Amino acid sequence: GDVRSWIRQRVGYGSSATALAQRHGDVVAPVRLPTAAAASWTAFALGLPLLGATAAAASAIALDRRLPDVPERHREAARLSGLGQVHAASVLASGATRTWWPASLLAALVSTRARRVLVAAIVVPTLFDWWKVRRSIDLGRFAALRILDDAAYGAGVWKGAFEGRSFAALRPRLTDTESVRALFAGWLGRATSPERAPSRR
């Protein structure tokens, strides 16, 4: 009885996400990330490590350019960028196993790579969060409650989306797109500039 009531409550919370998204827009987006970080991890998940590394490097360079000219600026930019990538991985894992879990599960049923990514998105954050409360709850119970909570909330979000005929609560919010575009535009401009073109004789 208590478990059913709790599940209904979590589904109800998820169902309200559509109305909140329609009222407040991107403020309540399920995932808010810099574009380069999202692109980096998406590329790694798709098995494109070179593209993922390029996006991560673009993120670090864009951050480096925004920092004030202080000693060891490049090292600080690399450190902050690394922390940002870890945070991005955590946010995307949460999105994949919570709000977007029906789509993640469907992908996992037809793709071995998607299955591995989903398992990692479930296992790694679960172990990390359980370790902090390991003295008060065993791993099995913690994992079961976490998965049940995420599944109920995510089901509620999709239920609300279909009932409200709006998928605003499912859309991610990507930030810092302009700086990334400017960075790639600069790279492209240098790569295609006449000075870099091979001379013809």
Model-identified regions with their sequence ranges:
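Membrane-embedded multi-pass helical conduit in multi-pass membrane proteins
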Residues: 43-163
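Membrane-penetrating hydrophobic segments
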Residues: 24-35, 46, 94-99
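Negatively charged linear elements and acidic catalytic determinants
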Residues: 19, 23-26, 160
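Actinobacteria-biased recognition of intrinsically disordered, low-complexity terminal regions
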Residues: 167-201
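Structured alpha-helical bundle/scaffold domains in large eukaryotic membrane-trafficking regulators
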Residues: 29, 163, 167-170
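Active-site donor/metal-binding and catalytic loop motifs
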Residues: 1-7, 16, 20
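Alpha-helical membrane-protein architecture signal
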Residues: 36-38, 144
